[in-house]
């Protein structure tokens, strides 16, 4: 069980960079525990404020409800209290509660509640869903505002009153007006996380709206670049930020946007590039082509910080 209160967890993750480690698979798509343990231990060596086990980049949508707590338990064992471990949960309310309870028992310090599966509902229904998950556990819960689960400011305010362990809000839609209204309504009651794909692109403008942290997928394979970029964001170092966007993030996005599902696949490919092969993505996602991996390799090799990452993998 976690030793952190929901408020302590929220304060901690709001103070630094976050990431969602990939979930390694073997050639037969079974979970590769040894590689996952090695990756988690390696990532903890960098300046990261929280790691989300079995999150979106960790292919939560392709994991079974029993796999999630197993993966969380391993993450907790390998991080050894160095950073908070948060777990993904989602689908319908009953399954989300089941996964949440299992993750809490496995030692998770918090939860990220992903949108319900292919279900559109009114605010009252979304609120009931969030409240049910919050009531099932004592650890902190972060809601992910995205796609078919967009909570409005008034709904969030009501939930914040009823659910003491609702401590975070992750934005995955990029609606500047909505983000502003949410922050204006709830202020410091929640910790705010930037959660758009390749969140580095939006990090600086979001910082000015009270969003002090974001989830970096590229931290998986270029952790030094990711942490240096985050430091530049917090310092509002425009020159360093725009250089990082121009030289790495935007070219990476160009590869990512070629096919649906590549937001996860390109991160797995990046792990292969630096010598930390974490296997294939599970269907229905598809892996990058050899040509695309070659392009990504060339892009990664241009980063000075990648040398130490490659050496660490050897």
UniProtKB/Swiss-Prot annotation:
InterPro entries in alphabetical order: Aldolase_TIM, DapA-like, Dehydro-deoxyglucarate_dehyd
SUPFAM superfamilies reported in the protein's UniProt record: Aldolase
Reactions that this protein is recorded to catalyse: 5-dehydro-4-deoxy-D-glucarate + H(+) = 2,5-dioxopentanoate + CO2 + H2O
Molecular function as annotated in GO: 4-hydroxy-tetrahydrodipicolinate synthase activity; 5-dehydro-4-deoxyglucarate dehydratase activity
Functional pathway: Carbohydrate acid metabolism; D-glucarate degradation; 2,5-dioxopentanoate from D-glucarate: step 2/2
UniProt GO BP: D-glucarate catabolic process
EC number: 4.2.1.41
Keyword vocabulary terms for this entry: Lyase
EC class (word): lyase
Similarity field: Belongs to the DapA family.
Cited PANTHER family: 5-DEHYDRO-4-DEOXYGLUCARATE DEHYDRATASE 2-RELATED, DIHYDRODIPICOLINATE SYNTHASE
Annotated protein name in UniProt: Probable 5-dehydro-4-deoxyglucarate dehydratase
Species assigned in the record: Bradyrhizobium diazoefficiens (strain JCM 10833 / BCRC 13528 / IAM 13628 / NBRC 14792 / USDA 110)
